[in-house]
Amino acid sequence: MNALTAVKANTDDLAQRHTGFTLAPSAQSPRLLALTFTADTTRQFLHQVAQWPVQALEYKSFLRFKIGKILDDLCGNQLQPLLIKTLLNRAQGALLISAEGIDDVAQAEEMVKLATAVAHLIGRSNYDAMSGQYYARFVVKNVDNSDSYLRQPHRVMELHNDGTYVEEVTDYVLMMKIDEQNMEGGNSLLLHLDDWEHLESFFTHPLARRVMRWAAPPSKNVSHDVWHPVFDVDQQGRPVMRYIDQFVQPKDFEEGVWLSELSDALETSQNILSVPVPVGKFLLINNLFWLHGRDRFTPHPDLRRELMRQRGYFAYAASHYQTHQ
């Protein structure tokens, strides 16, 4: 483990009696906390937000914050500060969130509402060019002919950060399981940057801070390239990453070889977490120091998984990129 942040469970938060939800370390790592809304909180939340269909949240962005306030009020106003504290805590920065009673694809709209409420307690979800909304829903099937690895089921989707090919700051990523049929495998893969064995050697390499070109395929609906280095630092000088192997465009032999070595070093890390995410649950991670990916699925002709993602910026004190410092 890197010396940057040793894992120290926040015993005060874990021992505290919370209103409307429970909190515990996940089975995979003390860095990843499991937060579960009680059945009563879930029922009251869905009742109070039933008047607004998801379309209303799409058209009136302030409603996303309103339903966040409803959820926080139901949790005795303990939820928002805990979410912010956890996600900004370098030693943690990740949550697996669920709500008792939300676990079926027939509740897809309710899932979007819940995830939206949580996300807008910490910041605001960015426009997603792939879907044209503040969130994107997409399906993984047994056969895929798309132009990126996002929907390809029979290979590992390598570890990466989101927001590498857009101008907007991407502080957080939310990934929710809406449906799953005939599925085996396909766990979410997570790696905390400070647990990566090779962080120091790559972060101190001369190419770590070189500005590189990033370009997305047509399905992303982004027509222009962006330029930034693989590594930056946060306000305390700690490493953060903006990296995805599919979209970085090395300009020469030196960059290409270094990027290939970086990819191999990430994928062979012994500290990658494999996290099952059942239907109705979602991961919420700090995108600056967590990388995420997906394990391969076992082939099945009727394989189907539907996911929903949101990604955006923290509206509170955050360690944004300090480019070229």
UniProtKB/Swiss-Prot annotation:
Pathway(s): Amino-acid degradation
InterPro entries named among the record's database cross-references: GlaH (IPR015038), TauD-like_sf (IPR042098)
Cofactors (names): Fe(2+)
Keyword Oxidoreductase belongs to the record: yes
Keywords from the named record: Dioxygenase, Iron, Metal-binding, Oxidoreductase
Gene Ontology biological-process annotations: L-lysine catabolic process
Gene Ontology molecular-function annotations: ferrous iron binding; glutarate dioxygenase activity; oxidoreductase activity, acting on paired donors, with incorporation or reduction of molecular oxygen, with 2-oxoglutarate as one donor, and the other dehydrogenated
Reaction catalysis annotation: glutarate + 2-oxoglutarate + O2 = (S)-2-hydroxyglutarate + succinate + CO2
Cofactor: how bound: Binds 1 Fe(2+) ion per subunit.
EC number(s) reported in the record: 1.14.11.64
Group of enzyme by EC: oxidoreductase
Cysteine pairings via disulfide bonds: none
Task performed by this protein: Acts as an alpha-ketoglutarate-dependent dioxygenase catalyzing hydroxylation of glutarate (GA) to L-2-hydroxyglutarate (L2HG). Functions in a L-lysine degradation pathway that proceeds via cadaverine, glutarate and L-2-hydroxyglutarate.
Subunit structure as annotated in this protein's UniProt entry: Homotetramer.
Family, per entry: Belongs to the glutarate hydroxylase family.
Protein name: Glutarate 2-hydroxylase
Source organism (scientific name): Salmonella paratyphi B (strain ATCC BAA-1250 / SPB7)
